Amino acid sequence: YFYRNKMEFSFSNARWLTQYEISSEENFGNKDALGFHIPGMWSKILDLQECFLQEAPSNDLRLAVRNYAIKNGLDFFDVRNQEGFLRTLMLRQNSQGEWMVLFQLYREEKENREQLFDYILEKFPQIKTLVYAINPKQNDSIYDLDVQTYFGEGFIYEEMDGLKFKIGPKSFFQTNYKQALNLYRKTLEFAEISENDVVYDLYT
């Protein structure tokens, strides 16, 4: 539990309903959701209330964003019609308890965006940097998008046995810090590297 340093969640105006909810024929009203995609149902999102994959305050932060957005009438993404405002939320942390928050927005709504960002920055002082990207594409890939920094430096740092890593919104970094550290240490042990050896990283 609580081993991942990076989690990505999707906004949707089509919350996944259980078979019980469907058979009840109740009118559920608001169907906005922030969470995970349902396997085999690309347009449906499981509205997460609690996730055991990432440390606190991940749950509180995600729910604060969700509840603020619903309360203030912000449009959750409609993947079928390709419209809406809020698209994805990425939460990333380092081992020092500092957080990066990344929003993907389908369109720009400057006033709504700034009010949402200011709200969570005030509520969660653990946030070291907050970044966002406008993504009107058909997919959620961020690598060809222009990421804007709203707060902080636009990245966080991680350290492993004297090595310092600069991690940005597009960076790949092992999602399990403790196991990555064990892996690096075991690799050094197997390699039997001395202080006089020259080491080449051929896979960067």
Feature annotation, model-predicted:
Residues 1-204:
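Accessory RNA-recognition modules of RNA-modification enzymes
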